[in-house]
């Protein structure tokens, strides 16, 4: 991304340059004629005004008075005024003579006018007819309402979401003699509106606790970002970095003792050399932070360095991460208790103890002759880590397990009486005698290893007089 260039500053005006360079005689060639009015244009106007006079036309550069005759205003259309409301004429003025009394009577004259209407006459007889009755029964009106009386009914339904608060009370106390003291409030019906309320239940260590406050969660720790690419990593070995870091940036004031656990701001003079070269041009040192990284406890502070100033007044503030390792964190090895492995030196099988593990099958041919009655079967030809087991038997054909304590499944093994000859063991494994031709040609090459020459394609471009090959 291209950086924005600062706007180019305009040089001083001709008047400012004339005031500074006139005395020293170092003015540019175009400054003195422009200020003193001796340019070619000024001379042409001066010479031309000697023979031609345009003063009466009002085209000069003076004040806009319009010349001798002045400006003539342009004509405007006449406007017609609308008639206003009629004016009430003034009433008759009563003059007061010197002989008139000065007290004005507040009693107004009567304004009743007699129009000569006839006076109504009141008849002497006639009027309303009054009916009398001789019944002495009092007149009683039935004011009982004929509407149906209001009946209030209460119904209850089981809601699995809402739990009645009365069911959440702790268990009642029980006395030593076994009596149970229970006190419950009676539920009375009311005509007011019942609004169901939600109860937030959070089960704690004991049963029956209700609360509407959610479980507080620890706030998430903000990420410091001390090891990003934007920060310069600077290790510090001076112990004063922990107690009084300001002594590494500026010279201490014995009267003032600041708090090193807050953000420190410094005012850098024009010529300043920090006591520690690593803290040169640092004008702000933020609060410390203890972190653990790579097995050590690290004391960190982030500082702002004032390095460059642009023409527009912008100051570049690169950030620096100062850190000091306090102590390593010892690695505790994980100890796992292991059981010792005990190997048995000699393992023998007794027919009486392990008679239910294996079966002995007698051969009728050998039983009649009685030969091999005192033969001993030895299973020692297996070259494995299993222990050698010797089992005496009076018969030749016997199926026995390899070992009594073996975790493997017993495999039936048939033993025959030995004839005294050593079995033939080949010196090397016997493989099938199949001729193998290593340098043969009866194979197929994978298509991915086949090189196919790419030919250049020719596209004809049709023009007015033929085509041109690509």
UniProtKB/Swiss-Prot annotation:
In its keyword annotation, does this UniProt entry include Ribonucleoprotein? Answer: no
Which keywords does this Swiss-Prot/TrEMBL entry list?
Capsid protein, Cytoplasmic inwards viral transport, Disulfide bond, DNA-binding, Host endosome, Host Golgi apparatus, Host nucleus, Host-virus interaction, Late protein, Microtubular inwards viral transport, Phosphoprotein, Viral penetration into host nucleus, Virion, Virus entry into host cell
The Gene Ontology biological process annotation of the record reads: microtubule-dependent intracellular transport of viral material towards nucleus; symbiont entry into host cell; viral penetration into host nucleus
Q: Which residues form a coiled coil?
A: none
Give the residue ranges of motif Nuclear localization signal. Answer: 1-12, 451-459
Q: Which GO terms describe its cellular component?
A: host cell; host cell endosome; host cell Golgi apparatus; host cell nucleus; viral capsid
Share the record's PTM remark.
Highly phosphorylated.
Q: Which GO terms describe its molecular function?
A: DNA binding; structural molecule activity
Q: Disulfide connectivity?
A: 21-27
Subunit structure comment from the entry: Interacts with major capsid protein L1. Interacts with E2; this interaction inhibits E2 transcriptional activity but not the DNA replication function E2. Interacts with host GADD45GIP1. Interacts with host HSPA8; this interaction is required for L2 nuclear translocation. Interacts with host importins KPNB2 and KPNB3. Forms a complex with importin alpha2-beta1 heterodimers via interaction with the importin alpha2 adapter. Interacts with host DYNLT1; this interaction is essential for virus intracellular transport during entry.
- Which family, according to UniProt? Belongs to the papillomaviridae L2 protein family.
- What is the protein name for this chain? Minor capsid protein L2
What is the protein's species of origin?
A: Human papillomavirus type 54
Q: What is the lineage of its organism?
A: Viruses, Monodnaviria, Shotokuvirae, Cossaviricota, Papovaviricetes
Question: Gene name on record?
Answer: L2
